[in-house]
Amino acid sequence: MTILAWCIAWVLDFIIGDPQHWPHPVRWIGRLITFVQRIVRRYCPGDKALRIGGGVMWVVVVGATWGVAWGVLALAQRIHPWFGWSVEVWMIFTTLAGRSLARAAQEVERPLRENDLAESRIKLSWIVGRDTSQLQPAQINRGVVETVAENTVDGIIAPLFFLFLGGAPLAMAYKAVNTLDSMVGYKHEKYRAIGMVSARMDDVANYLPARLSWLLLGIAAGLCRLSGWRALRIGWRDRYNHSSPNCAWSEACVAGALGIQLGGPNNYFGERVDKPWIGDAQRDISVDDISRTIRLMWVASTLALALFIAARCGLSGVA
């Protein structure tokens, strides 16, 4: 039944994703982070106090998320096993973001194909932290490909990894870790102190999933009739060409599969950031690379699901 729940949740994400205006745990986690952050900032003046307060915030948010998820699931199972199973499917479904990621990428791709540069810049600004107001088509394409490649890890592979390790409650706790990093894990002045623990713990949580993504995306590249060997080679060569210890693993693998370059200089919060280049520019990046990257994401996520199901069956002896 557990494996069936995994499969149904994955299929639901593939088909419908997160319908707009539906209640979603990540939104609740975000509200909790905002509430706790306000308290921490009020009572923790100075960088040292903010770092400690940020650590307490991380423990409170992640612990509360795991505890509530475990409690809701346990209560639902006591009401009725089938109700508990349905709640488990729903929880797992909410931790996966493949369809939402694909839709967000396609929202940028569509105006690009129609030569509506202004609209594509606006849509890209919804999914990246960089300044998009002056970006040209090649830079927009690169931003979308990087976003899909990076979020293949924290939107699909990592939730499945923690689902395998500790069930739906641990997958929900991972989403709290990831949401904390998304909201406060920045290096600029406002969040550097309060978000330090959140940023570092997100790096820890994604350490193994990011490295697993290198292998899965390399295999996916071969299955998609791209260069799987080049994906693995470039992915390994450029795996540390990023300020994050994890992001370049998936980005470099995708760059290698497509034969393009990612990374490079961008503006974040009014500051120019010169990132290392990732991959080799064997050709110019194009709008078609967005759909190719989405395809790689889906194949890699399918492989991840199959891998964790096989591992679960091997450990439990239950097919």
UniProtKB/Swiss-Prot annotation:
Recorded GO CC terms: plasma membrane
Primary location class: membrane
Transmembrane segments: 56-76, 82-102, 153-173, 204-224, 296-316
Sorted UniProt keywords: Cell membrane, Cobalamin biosynthesis, Membrane, Transmembrane, Transmembrane helix
Any one GO molecular function term: ABC-type vitamin B12 transporter activity
Pathway(s): Cofactor biosynthesis; adenosylcobalamin biosynthesis
Name of the gene this protein is made from: cbiB
Role this protein plays: Converts cobyric acid to cobinamide by the addition of aminopropanol on the F carboxylic group. However, the true cosubstrate could be (R)-1-amino-2-propanol O-2-phosphate, leading to cobinamide phosphate.
Membrane topology field: Multi-pass membrane protein
GO biological process entries: cobalamin biosynthetic process
UniProt name for this protein: Cobalamin biosynthesis protein CbiB
Keyword Phosphoprotein on entry: no
Source species: Salmonella paratyphi B (strain ATCC BAA-1250 / SPB7)
Family: Belongs to the CobD/CbiB family.
Tagged with keyword Cell membrane: yes
Compartment(s) of residence: Cell membrane
